[in-house]
């Protein structure tokens, strides 16, 4: 201090010659003098420079000169003055010749420089914006505690009278230090001009004082707010820049790319050297090197480079915590020595009790700081890895997309990323428990001598068993993840293709397939869990075996006596060893899971990407008349391993040209556009595009946003141009009818729009782009005749908005070819011919063959004109005045309702009030605590008998544990005769028997919880799947797919793993708490007085915490659903995103969604630490109470009983803290059960099968269909979409159904298949009302070929014969009939060929023919074709028509068509208008009437 006391007497620093009064002190006066003088300066000079360097690089602006800062500076300068005066006095005395020890000059000088450094730190902190300093807080605390203790002992020894001036100076300095310490507990004002931008709701951590940060009291405001009212997202704090995705992902991506490049160079060098040294063996080594060196290692290294500082800081906190952890056994040894010796004064026992309390508190604070740092690291790593996965999704090549379905990607971000980040908490568990074990053995050696060596043998003998178990668990874990992927992929396909499944009545078959995979998944999970239980019990048994063997050897072999100090200090050390041995299997278990997930992530991140060098592109555009697109001798393949799909393409397209691409199904039309986009792998050749590119895919992709955001697609809003685009794309009337106009949300996957509206919206997005090159993949296929003609004339054609731009149009509409500047005919992946329309007609080559196929055979008399003769000028007439007026009249003559209201729009109205609970893009959120019914639902799923059995087993093993500890206390109190205990063998034998019984009960109880959890998982998943699959089609149209996928992936994983794990831990710790409370109450009854208030405080903390934590968990789940939905949406539209060069805006959107999810996760993270820190601090009070009560009752208690009580009290802090945490975690996890039950009460479809109905096989025999005054509405509050429809279709009759968009054509098919139930009237088939027939019975007797052909992930045979009702011969015959036999025979595996999700590896025409083959195999009496030929070329359409005429000649056929050409062969045509049958008759009769059908034929160019 400024005025140090006299130096130590005697030799050295430590005084060994204290007088008798001081000898009774636990700490010598010389130690206090030395520590008080040197420890605070050493502390500041060691940490101060590091702290200065840190704040120099992490400044946050600067602080104003506040009153708090001024007070600190005044006190600091006052301390400097006092230290200076002490130095001056010492120098003056030396100058006067007064004999003084050197310490009287050295000590004040050291304190003077240290105080000056402290003042400098205070000033620097203000400059760098530090509001509260932990380093100075610790310094002022040390400056007060150690010198104050020294001064107090000197004062009690009459040292004050020896030099009153120096001691007055000391007390004055102590007073100033106390004032500085108090000020250091306060936080200064926020920084002025901070480097981070101002946030709307900043996290209070940055402005909290150091004590508040250490105890996490800055979280209390949020917890209290959550207790008073439900928390909302706006109540949560903003996310700091250091935690933002933009910052984290960019850093990780940069390091990863750098490491990958270095690894590739290294591997190439090694491969080159090995090739030179071993000849042909080099290629064998390269895959190994590529797998081991260039995949997982660079990513792991990058993660370490980015996040190592946070991890090391947390590890340092953990090491300091462990120092205090091992201080407790030493203090306990001294305490039991004090209890056993009646001579020492009572204050010594109280001092030891205080020291144990302080050590436990410091252990708590540092341990919670470690957990906080690692949790923050976990959150940051999650953001970074999710960002990497998202960026990879945007860069996947076509071959990689086939290998990774949407469900796989969702599984990666929802499960694998979570498991990988959770492993951060257990990384130190691989080495730190080993250090604990070594330290424990050192303690045991000190206590028991050579007998402790036997513990090493027992422990090491069990290690091979655990390594073997870990290896087996790894195998089963990988199997479970494989099955999880298969289930996720199939479940995703079911949810996305629910309409197709319901069309065919396949729900039951898909349920069986999913549940079969689920059964294998749970089987692997059960086996893995049982192995984990064996591992955990083996570690528990190893602890007991160590104690048993050590005690037995110590007492029986070495013939030593047991006493309380040996028994219970050993027991305390073994409890630490128990934690180490429990932590180790948890760490191994977590890291085994993380390794599997990490390998899967690395495999995905290393998939093949789109090569940006395939196309030589320029955004500047080309001059008029110059070539805009050039392809020279180019050959393309879908991936580097697959055979070429386009051969020797040579093509030059000048700027402003309209190029039409035609050809049969599978000719390579869409592949050509993909090649121009750079989506294909270029085998050879050259490709160049000048100017910005816009792309319209064949299958429209839209975002889950508003109409205007879909059209603008990240560009600035230009209202006049937007209006022109919407009008040209025939969207303006639709938009006008939407409830919020252009700001109306269209729902996920455009579920509020029809297929035609989605296609026009996709086209409008491209047109709005004002690009130089437009790649249009059959955009007119999903549009009816008049809308398609309008769109072509107004947008694509020579007089449209895109005139002057380069347009490559893939089309099957041959009647528009005369207006194209140039035509390419593709066949078998090569250009068959190209030229102008007239040139190709004159050649009479491939184009003429297509026109001949498209020309209808026979003399029908409809007056259909050949496309070549529809206009005199192949380019000019559409741009003239007269055709423009005719088109305008044709559009305006249609009533507004017909033009704007699609059937899908009618099905799911955008202004539906019921949709308020299901907004697009937002998940449902419950508020308040989880209801008891949810807990009961889970327990019922487990089974009441199994629940009671598990509780009984836990009780039995805990009774055995109590008896074992009590028996040890009796053993310790046995008197020794001749240095030995006569009953040692009996005591040891019963001790061992009780331990074995406890181990058996522990394994049985954990196995019971595990098996019960697996049973509950199976039932809850089965109910969720059943509830979703049994829902009507409207449920899928209004529920975002991401919300469903989240429940089938993340929530299911929580129910599978987290709930059984938390339940097992809760029961273990709850019964352990009962044991500890009983021990303390029996041994030291006075401690009961402290136990009851502590329990009340614990209950208060839990009540405050649980409500907020559960609500935060719900908000977190809902926010993460948005991340999954956006990830899935981007995966499906990545080609469009790349084509428009909008990767950066999409990455920004993903960053915003992930940041929002993390903004909600962070409060839950720190709330956990708030609970743990404060609950453990309260629990440490029980240690103090038990020790204090033991001192008070020292005369009445045996040493063994006191040891039993205090050692148990030392465990109550961790035990009670884990009870609260596991209960809270269990309630947080049980939210997943609540979310899985969200759809249990939604409306369901009619029964699939009815036990008694008239529709028994062979119904229907004839296929007669009769609509009687049929009416249909899609919602109860909506008007009828179809009304008053009455007609009869005779058995075997082929009837066409036509009409404008929204006329009600597809509604008739929906009513016939009962996708929507009749609102009035009904439908009869062969005289049987379909309302009296089960849904599956009805749908299995009707075949439908929908507009969008869907294939499911799985074999081709499964897609054709899902119910396995047909032989291979029958399937091959059906394929031959649809002319796909040769194609399938060429595929790898043939019928066992694995189809990609939604059949993306096949063309639309090929998929349509496969659907036709599927209908051939079903052999039903009724067939519905719902726009089945809209997306196929005329040749394929004629092929399908011919098969309908031959194979379905005896069937009743309903042909819903856009192309009137398709219905000209029908015996009768129904013309729908405004939901009613407007006209009915043969095509010739309807044309002669010159009514609505005639006008439609005019618009189609047929008359």
From Swiss-Prot:
Domain ABC transmembrane type-1: 311-593, 947-1228
Membrane topology, Extracellular segments: 1-31, 94-98, 150-167, 324-349, 448-450, 555-575, 961-997, 1083, 1197-1198
Bias (Basic and acidic residues): 881-901
Modification type Phosphoserine: residues: 1286
SMART domains in the cross-refs: AAA
EC primary class: translocase
Pfam families: ABC_membrane (PF00664), ABC_tran (PF00005), TMD0_ABC (PF24357)
Lipid bilayer topology: Multi-pass membrane protein
Resulting phenotype, residue 760 to W: In PXE; protein level is 15-20% that of the WT proteins; maturation of glycan chains is not affected indicating normal trafficking from the endoplasmic reticulum to the cell membrane
Outcome of swapping residue 765 to Q: In PXE; affects protein expression and trafficking; expression is reduced to less than 10%, when compared with the WT protein
UniProt keywords, alphabetically: ATP-binding, Cell membrane, Disease variant, Endoplasmic reticulum, Glycoprotein, Membrane, Nucleotide-binding, Phosphoprotein, Repeat, Sensory transduction, Translocase, Transmembrane, Transmembrane helix, Transport, Vision
Result for mutant: residue 755 to R: In PXE; does not change protein biosynthesis and folding
Substitution effect: residue 820 to P: In PXE; affects protein expression and trafficking
PROSITE patterns: ABC_TM1F (PS50929), ABC_TRANSPORTER_1 (PS00211), ABC_TRANSPORTER_2 (PS50893)
GO molecular function, one term: ATPase-coupled transmembrane transporter activity
Effect after changing residue 709 to G: Found in patient with putative diagnosis of PEX; uncertain significance; loss-of-function mutation; localization comparable to wild-type
Requisite cofactors: Mg(2+)
Entry PTM: Glycosylated.
Disulfide bonds: none
Stretches for region Disordered: 854-919
Membrane-spanning intervals of the chain: 32-52, 73-93, 99-119, 132-149, 168-188, 303-323, 350-370, 427-447, 451-471, 534-554, 576-596, 940-960, 998-1018, 1062-1082, 1084-1104, 1176-1196, 1199-1219
Family: Belongs to the ABC transporter superfamily. ABCC family. Conjugate transporter (TC 3.A.1.208) subfamily.
Protein name as catalogued: ATP-binding cassette sub-family C member 6
Organism of origin: Homo sapiens (Human)
């Amino acid at each position: 201090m400024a005025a140090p006391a006299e130096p130590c007497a005697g030799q050295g620093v430590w005084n060994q010659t204290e007088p008798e009064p001081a000898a009774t002190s636990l700490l010598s006066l010389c130690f206090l003098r030395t520590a008080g003088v040197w420890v605070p300066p050493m502390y500041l000079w060691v940490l101060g420079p590091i702290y200065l360097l840190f704040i120099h690089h992490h400044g946050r602006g600067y602080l104003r000169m506040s009153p708090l800062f001024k007070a600190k500076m005044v006190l600091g300068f006052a301390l400097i003055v006092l230290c200076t005066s002490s130095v001056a006095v010492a120098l003056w005395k030396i100058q006067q010749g007064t004999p003084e020890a050197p310490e009287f000059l050295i000590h004040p000088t050291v304190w003077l420089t240290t105080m000056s450094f402290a003042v400098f730190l205070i000033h620097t902190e203000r400059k760098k914006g530090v509001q509260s300093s932990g380093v100075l807080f610790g310094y002022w605390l040390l400056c007060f505690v150690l010198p104050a203790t020294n001064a107090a002992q000197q004062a009690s020894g009459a040292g004050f009278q020896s030099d009153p001036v120096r001691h007055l100076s000391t007390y004055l300095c102590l007073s100033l230090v106390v004032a500085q310490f108090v000020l250091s507990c306060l936080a200064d004002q926020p920084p002025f001009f901070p480097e981070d931008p101002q946030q709307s709701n900043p996290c209070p951590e940055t402005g909290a004082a150091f004590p508040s940060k250490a105890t996490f009291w800055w979280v209390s405001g949020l917890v209290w707010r959550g207790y008073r009212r439900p928390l909302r997202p706006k109540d949560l704090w903003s996310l700091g820049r250091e935690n933002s995705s933009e910052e984290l992902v960019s850093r990780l991506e940069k390091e990863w790319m750098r490491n990958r490049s270095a690894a590739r160079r290294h591997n190439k060098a090694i491969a080159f050297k090995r090739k030179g040294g071993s000849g042909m063996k080099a290629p064998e080594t390269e895959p190994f090197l590529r797998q081991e060196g260039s995949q997982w290692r660079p990513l792991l290294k990058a993660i370490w480079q980015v996040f190592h500082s946070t991890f090391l800081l947390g590890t340092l906190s953990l090491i300091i915590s462990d120092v205090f952890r091992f201080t407790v056994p030493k203090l306990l040894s001294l305490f039991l020595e004090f209890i056993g010796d009646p001579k020492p004064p009572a204050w010594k026992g109280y001092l030891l009790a205080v020291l144990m309390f302080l050590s436990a508190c410091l252990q708590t604070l540092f341990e919670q700081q470690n957990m906080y740092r690692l949790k923050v690291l976990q959150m940051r790593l999650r953001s970074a890895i999710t960002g990497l996965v998202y960026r990879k999704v945007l860069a996947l090549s076509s071959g990689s997309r086939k290998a990774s379905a949407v469900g796989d990607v969702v599984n990666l971000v929802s499960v694998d990323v979570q498991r990988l980040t959770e492993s951060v908490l257990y990384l130190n568990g691989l080495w730190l428990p080993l250090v604990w074990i070594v330290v424990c053995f050192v303690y045991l050696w000190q206590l028991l001598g050579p007998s402790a060596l036997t513990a090493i043998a027992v422990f090491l003998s069990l290690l091979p068993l655990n390594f073997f178990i870990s290896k087996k668990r790894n195998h089963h874990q990988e199997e479970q993840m494989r099955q999880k992927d298969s289930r996720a992929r199939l479940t995703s396909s079911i949810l996305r293709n629910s309409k197709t499944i319901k069309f065919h009545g396949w729900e039951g078959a898909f349920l069986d397939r999913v549940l079969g995979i689920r059964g294998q998944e749970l089987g692997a999970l059960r086996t893995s869990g049982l192995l984990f239980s064996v591992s955990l019990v083996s570690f528990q048994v190893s602890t007991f075996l160590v104690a048993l063997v050590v005690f037995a050897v110590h007492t029986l072999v070495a013939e030593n006596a047991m006493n309380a100090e040996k028994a219970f200090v050993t027991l305390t050390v073994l409890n630490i060893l128990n934690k180490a041995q429990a932590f180790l299997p948890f760490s191994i278990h977590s890291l085994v899971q993380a390794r599997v997930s990490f390998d899967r992530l690395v495999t995905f991140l290393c998939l093949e990407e789109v090569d940006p060098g395939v196309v030589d592109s320029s955004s500047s555009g080309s001059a008029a008349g110059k070539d805009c697109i050039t392809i020279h001798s180019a050959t393309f393949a879908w991936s580097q391993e697959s055979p070429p799909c386009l051969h020797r393409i040579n093509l030059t397209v000048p700027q402003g040209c309209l190029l039409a691409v035609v050809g049969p199904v599978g000719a390579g039309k869409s592949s050509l556009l993909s090649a121009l986009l750079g989506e294909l792998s270029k085998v050879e050749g050259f490709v160049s595009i000048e100017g910005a590119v816009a792309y319209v895919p064949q299958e429209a992709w839209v975002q889950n946003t508003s109409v205007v955001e879909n059209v603008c697609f990240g560009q600035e809003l230009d209202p006049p141009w937007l209006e022109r685009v919407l009008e040209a794309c025939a969207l303006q009337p639709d938009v006008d009818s939407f409830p919020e106009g252009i700001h109306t949300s269209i729902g996920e996957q455009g579920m509020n729009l029809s297929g035609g509206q989605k296609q026009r919206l996709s086209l409008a997005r491209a047109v709005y782009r004002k690009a130089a090159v437009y790649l249009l993949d059959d955009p007119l296929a999903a549009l009816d005749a008049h809308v398609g003609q309008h769109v072509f004339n107004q947008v694509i054609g020579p007089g449209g908005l895109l005139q002057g731009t380069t347009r490559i149009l893939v089309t099957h509409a041959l009647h528009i070819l005369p207006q194209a500047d140039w035509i390419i005919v593709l066949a078998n992946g090569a250009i068959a011919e190209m030229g102008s329309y007239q040139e190709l007609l004159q050649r009479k080559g491939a184009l003429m063959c297509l026109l001949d196929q498209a020309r209808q055979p026979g003399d029908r008399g409809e007056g259909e004109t050949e496309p070549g003769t529809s206009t005199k000028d192949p380019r000019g007439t559409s741009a003239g005045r007269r055709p423009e007026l005719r088109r305008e009249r044709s559009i305006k003559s249609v009533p507004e309702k017909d033009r704007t209201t699609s059937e899908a729009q009618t099905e799911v109205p955008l202004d539906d009030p019921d949709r308020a609970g299901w907004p697009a893009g937002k998940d449902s959120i419950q508020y308040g605590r989880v209801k008891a019914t949810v807990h009961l639902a889970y327990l019922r799923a487990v089974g009441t008998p199994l629940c009671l059995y598990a509780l009984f087993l836990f009780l039995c093993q805990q009774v055995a544990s109590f008896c074992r500890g009590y028996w040890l206390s009796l053993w310790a109190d046995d008197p020794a005769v001749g240095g030995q205990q006569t009953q040692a063998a009996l005591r040891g034998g019963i001790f061992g028997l009780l331990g074995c019984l406890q181990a058996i009960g522990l394994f049985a109880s954990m196995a019971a919880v595990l098996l019960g959890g697996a049973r509950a998982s199976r039932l809850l998943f089965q109910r969720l799947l059943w509830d979703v699959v049994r829902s009507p089609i409207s449920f899928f149209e209004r529920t975002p797919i991401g919300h469903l996928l989240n429940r089938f992936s993340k929530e299911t994983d929580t129910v599978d793993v987290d709930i059984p794990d938390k339940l097992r831990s809760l029961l273990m710790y709850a019964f352990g708490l009962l044991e500890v409370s009983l021990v303390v109450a029996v041994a030291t009854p006075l401690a009961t007085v402290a136990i009851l208030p502590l329990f009340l405080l614990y209950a208060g903390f839990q009540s405050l915490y649980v409500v907020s934590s559960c609500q935060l968990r719900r908000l977190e789940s809902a926010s993460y659903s948005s991340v999954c939905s956006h990830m899935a949406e981007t995966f499906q539209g990545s080609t469009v995103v790349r084509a428009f060069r909008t990767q950066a805006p999409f990455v920004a959107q993903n960053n915003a969604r992930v940041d929002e999810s993390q903004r909600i996760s962070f409060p839950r993270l720190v709330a956990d630490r708030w609970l743990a820190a404060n609950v453990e601090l309260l629990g440490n009070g029980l240690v103090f109470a038990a020790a204090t009560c033991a001192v008070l009752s020292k005369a009445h208690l045996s040493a063994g009983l006191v040891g039993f009580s205090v050692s148990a009290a030392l465990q109550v802090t961790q035990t009670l803290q884990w009870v609260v945490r596991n209960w809270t975690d269990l309630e947080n996890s049980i939210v997943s059960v609540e979310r899985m039950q969200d759809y249990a009460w939604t409306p369901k479809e009619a029964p699939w099968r009815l036990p008694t109905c008239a529709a028994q096989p062979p119904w229907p025999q004839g296929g007669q269909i009769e609509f009687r005054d049929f009416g249909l509405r899609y919602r109860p509050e909506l008007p009828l979409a179809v009304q008053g429809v009455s007609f009869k279709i005779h058995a075997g009759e082929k009837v066409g159904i036509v009409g404008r968009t929204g006329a009600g054509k597809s509604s008739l098919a929906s009513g016939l298949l009962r996708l929507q139930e009749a609102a009035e009237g009904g439908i009869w088939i062969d005289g049987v009302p379909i309302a009296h027939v089960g849904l599956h019975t009805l749908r299995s007797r009707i075949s439908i070929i929908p507009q969008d052909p869907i294939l499911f992930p799985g074999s081709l045979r499964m897609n054709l014969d899902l119910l396995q009702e047909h032989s291979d011969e029958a399937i091959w015959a059906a394929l031959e009939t649809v002319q796909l036999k040769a194609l399938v025979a060429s595929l790898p595996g043939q019928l066992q060929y694995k189809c990609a999700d939604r059949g993306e590896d096949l063309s639309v025409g090929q998929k349509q023919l496969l659907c036709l083959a599927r209908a051939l195999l079903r052999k039903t009496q009724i067939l519905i074709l719902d726009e089945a030929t809209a997306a196929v070329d005329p040749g394929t359409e004629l092929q399908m028509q011919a098969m309908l005429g031959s194979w379905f000649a005896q069937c009743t056929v309903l042909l819903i068509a856009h192309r009137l050409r398709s219905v000209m062969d029908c015996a009768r045509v129904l013309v729908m208008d405004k939901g009613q049958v407007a006209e009915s008759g043969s095509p010739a009769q309807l044309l002669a009437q010159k009514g609505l059908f005639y006008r439609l034929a005019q618009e189609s160019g047929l008359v």
